[in-house]
């Protein structure tokens, strides 16, 4: 029953946004563990500023027009108890942005487990994945090669994937990541 409610709610919001935009939206699912910086990244893109955020309980949704695409970005909370609800946001997803706290080496196994779980979902079959390696402004941030190795991304053969180092605070790498998403979707 709860599952049906969340599916209906997600469809409702997508349809409402489509009416206002006058065209079909591209649906982007932005997920990652708690504290990775998903909401900070989303609001930086939408508003151009760093906004003080609190942990997302549920979701944030924003429509961003970028590279001739109207992207409805669903930022879903990453706390352990909320991750079970991610599946309710899969339907109709065109791309996944998985935000990683690249300073949190202790949780990379947990990140890998969540990405591996996404890869086996029928509703996400073949859907491209952008890994935004956030918090690159910190001295102890993992580089791209370390992220790729920690998450065993080279084993992914059934879809496009890309790792973009970024810093939500400094705006570094965010637009390059969204360029990759936009170009990949435009070339489908």
Curated annotation (Swiss-Prot):
Main location: Golgi
Listed transmembrane segments: none
A single MF term (Gene Ontology): GTP binding
InterPro entries on file: P-loop_NTPase (IPR027417), Small_GTP-bd (IPR005225), Small_GTPase_ARF (IPR024156), Small_GTPase_ARF/SAR (IPR006689)
Keyword Protein transport attributed: yes
Alphabetical keyword list: ER-Golgi transport, Golgi apparatus, GTP-binding, Nucleotide-binding, Protein transport, Transport
Entries under SUPFAM superfamilies matching the protein: P-loop containing nucleoside triphosphate hydrolases
Binding site for GTP: 34-40, 75-79, 134-137
GO biological process, one term: vesicle-mediated transport
Family matches, as SMART domains: ARF (SM00177), RAB (SM00175), SAR (SM00178)
Functional description taken from the UniProt entry: GTP-binding protein that may be involved in protein trafficking. May modulate vesicle budding and uncoating within the Golgi apparatus.
Family assignment from sequence similarity: Belongs to the small GTPase superfamily. Arf family.
Protein name: ADP-ribosylation factor K
Native source species: Dictyostelium discoideum
UniProt gene name: arrK
